[in-house]
A protein has these predicted regions:
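Short beta-strand element of the alpha/beta-hydrolase
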Residues: 18-27
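Mobile cap/lid helix-loop segments that gate and shape the active-site cleft of serine hydrolases
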Residues: 133-167, 173
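C-terminal catalytic histidine-bearing segment of alpha/beta-hydrolase fold enzymes
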Residues: 188, 192-253
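Primarily recognizes the serine-hydrolase "nucleophile elbow" in alpha/beta-hydrolase
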Residues: 73-143, 159-160
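Catalytic nucleophile-loop/oxyanion-hole region of alpha/beta-hydrolase
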Residues: 33-36, 40, 53-91, 220-228
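Short beta-strand/loop motif that positions the catalytic acidic residue
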Residues: 177-179, 183
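A fold-wide structural signal in alpha/beta-hydrolase
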Residues: 21, 46-53, 93, 206
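N-terminal cap/lid segment of alpha/beta-hydrolase-fold proteins
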Residues: 1-17, 143
Length: 253
């Protein structure tokens, strides 16, 4: 049975063999999920030949570790193949926006839920795409996300444990990251510091900072500057052997 809130958007048929899959985590400040960062993004990934799974993870009034539990359960479900799609279990990634980017980054840095069946290396993605992420809860953090996820006055040790840039290791998966320099909701330093930590650990990272653009652009169609992110990301996924051209099939299949 599929985990709560998980829906699949299959890549078009036409290629033999298993394909990569990506878990999509929409943003919304851990208070809601933004629809424009959910199924439309999954459909874009599917057009690249990647199976996509959208997770409507738990949000406030549920607190940590509920969203992380949901995300890890979804990752394990995607890898184990119970969904019936031909997924390559060695190529399962994550894509997150804003607070969903925080959830994606904490998956990548193996943040703990305290549940041994979920705190499994198989729940760590093989790559990540982070879109204007809330990467830090300690430095220029998005306070709304902090309050919705952790409540009032969370302990500093927990804030540190859930700040992705402080928990990067050489085993953290590669990342494609983008942000806008004038994001007034989630400062660009979140992306800069996470990318810096990845590079310092020897982890491949591609970072794009666009001079202008409001927070929450999603696919950013028609937006000068940020509207390039999907083509840049598709090229990155192609170089990694995960994607074909739009409406095509995944490379290597």
């Amino acid at each position: 049975m599929a985990p709560r809130g998980l829906t699949a958007v299959a890549a078009p048929s036409g290629a033999a063999g298993p394909r990569p899959a990506i878990l999509v985590l929409p943003g919304g400040g851990y208070a809601r999920q933004a629809d424009h960062e959910a199924e439309p993004v999954a459909e874009w990934l599917a057009a690249l030949g990647i199976h996509a799974f959208v997770l409507r993870y738990r949000v406030a009034p549920d607190r940590h570790p509920a969203p992380l539990e949901d995300a890890k359960e979804a990752m394990l479900h995607i890898r184990n193949g119970e969904h019936g799609l031909p997924v390559d279990a060695e190529r399962v990634g994550v894509l997150g926006f804003s607070a969903g980017g925080h959830l994606a980054a904490t998956l990548c840095t193996a943040a703990a839920t305290g549940k041994p069946d979920l705190d499994n290396p198989a729940a760590v993605p093989d790559l990540s795409v982070l879109c204007y992420p809330v990467a830090s809860l300690t430095h220029e953090a998005h306070q709304g996300s902090v309050a919705n996820l952790l409540g009032d006055a969370p302990p500093s040790a927990l804030l540190t444990a859930l700040s992705a840039e402080l928990n990067v290791t050489p085993r953290t998966p590669p990342a494609f990251i983008w942000h806008t320099a004038d994001d007034e909701a989630v400062p660009v330093s979140n992306s800069l510091n996470y990318a810096r930590a990845l590079i310092a650990a020897g982890v491949p990272a591609e970072l794009h900072v666009f001079p202008e653009g409001r927070h929450g652009l999603g696919l950013a169609a028609g937006e000068p500057g940020p509207g390039q992110w999907t083509s840049l990301c598709a090229a990155w996924l192609q170089r990694a052997g995960w994607a074909g051209s739009p409406t095509g099939t995944a490379a290597g299949n």
